[in-house]
Design a protein with these regions (language model features):
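Active-site metal-binding motif and surrounding structural segment of the metallo-beta-lactamase
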Residues: 24
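A short, surface-exposed loop/turn module that caps and links secondary-structure elements
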Residues: 30-54
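Enriched for short, Lys/Arg-rich terminal
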Residues: 2-7, 11, 18, 56-61, ...
Length: 86
């Protein structure tokens, strides 16, 4: 599966601590093999139809959706208390 990151995602990603960036890269590799792997704690966001989250740490999440080609589009990353407000 192909993953794409939006400009907004990349902008927020650059602001994250190095340790969170490395953990996301690890999670992304798992995601590409199986987006429903239990280590990702993938959840559907009820308030945002078609949007899902994966857990990076207990506090950090990344949001994504699937485009018409089946590619995963990551559009937000950040602290769990702030990310859903975007």
């Amino acid at each position: 599966m192909k993953t794409v990151k939006t400009k907004d995602f990349e902008k927020e990603f650059t602001k994250l601590p190095f340790s969170i960036k490395k953990l996301f890269e690890t999670q992304e590799k798992i995601f590409q093999k199986n987006w429903l792997d239990s280590r990702l704690h993938t959840k559907r966001i009820k308030e945002l139809p078609g949007v899902y989250s994966i857990r990076i740490t207990r506090r950090y999440r990344a949001l994504f959706y699937f485009d018409k080609n089946g590619d995963a589009i990551f559009f937000a990353i950040g602290h769990r208390k702030e990310i859903y407000r975007q």
